[in-house]
Amino acid sequence: MTITMLKSKIHRATVTEANLNYVGSITIDKYLMDKANILEYEKVQIVDIDNGNRFETYVIAGEKHSDVICLNGAAARMVQKGDKIIIMSYCSLTIDEANKFNPTVLFVDNKNNIEKLTNYEKHGEII
């Protein structure tokens, strides 16, 4: 048996663009992807902190160090430029694997620069 666990998270990223006329996906700065352990074409869940929308899409790599967070295609209707979002990916692990696993959690500032990189979250605290 496997369970689904949080693998990677980019917390409070700022949407820099919303491109309705693109095929689909979310474009994420390749540097942020690498630091957060998110792969190109990986399925992610997006939570918009400003409006409460939750949806899934896949990732495409943006230019490294561009700080881009761009929702493309239909997903562009779910956000506004400037919204704060949480980007999460998940993995399937056995119970034994899950008990030893820690996700990669990336906290970013208003310009999508990394403030903190950790493998642990505690309720009410930024570790």
Swiss-Prot record:
Modified residues (Pyruvic acid (Ser)): 25
Catalyzed reaction equations: L-aspartate + H(+) = beta-alanine + CO2
InterPro entries: Asp_de-COase-like_dom_sf, Asp_decarbox
BP terms from Gene Ontology: alanine biosynthetic process; pantothenate biosynthetic process
Cofactor binding annotation: Binds 1 pyruvoyl group covalently per subunit.
NCBIfam families membership: panD
PANTHER family in the cross-refs: ASPARTATE 1-DECARBOXYLASE
Protein name: Aspartate 1-decarboxylase
